[in-house]
Amino acid sequence: MKLKFCGFTSIEDVTAASQLPIDAIGFIHYEKSKSHQTITQIKKLASAVPEHIDKVCVVVNPDLTTIEHVLSNTPINTIQLHGTESIDFIQEIKKKYSSIKITKALAADENIIQNINKYKGFVDLFIIDTPSVSYGGTGQTYDWTILKHIKDIPYLIAGGINSENIQTVNQLKLSHQGFDLASGIEVNGRKDIEKMTAIVNIVKGDRENE
């Protein structure tokens, strides 16, 4: 099972998370988000992430210039698109930056299968999140059984995941590859090492001991 921890805003939190066996650390470049970081801030934070952990920049309906600025000025190796980006736009990114991974966030709504089929040939991974007009970051969960119809597609579950409900998700026997957490590993807006460690022990510990 993969783990992505997202919404980092401090070097201390990045350093603490980087000591754990996680797969990706995310930074948000979207001014309407409470966790928004400038490209300069992302450069500093992402530079503290070890080589073996993916460095993800979350953007919402960006233009190509924004993508270029992120990739030219930071160690980011994955772009997470969280808006209504077109296939043409994704292909533009891929053409210019062939080694960059593209993740597409989708809402867990009645159009989820249709949207997966639309994007699946063009992205490396999906994040399936709680439906929201604010493009994620709600801290709210959704009915995970909607994901039972999704097979043979690489995706992470996001949206209000925490150490209390993550076992419930795993009991559903879905085909997800892992989880993407932000508010579920926070206390008072900062990442909490105890919460992060608890999630790692549940997701990685159990799996590794099977």
From Swiss-Prot:
The keyword Protein biosynthesis does not apply. Keywords: Amino-acid biosynthesis, Aromatic amino acid biosynthesis, Isomerase, Tryptophan biosynthesis. Its EC number is 5.3.1.24. InterPro entries: Aldolase_TIM, PRAI_dom, RibuloseP-bd_barrel, TrpF_fam. It comes from the Bacteria. It holds the Pfam family PRAI. Pathway: Amino-acid biosynthesis; L-tryptophan biosynthesis; L-tryptophan from chorismate: step 3/5. GO terms for molecular function: phosphoribosylanthranilate isomerase activity. One of its GO terms (biological process) is L-tryptophan biosynthetic process. It catalyses: N-(5-phospho-beta-D-ribosyl)anthranilate = 1-(2-carboxyphenylamino)-1-deoxy-D-ribulose 5-phosphate. Belongs to the TrpF family. This is N-(5'-phosphoribosyl)anthranilate isomerase.
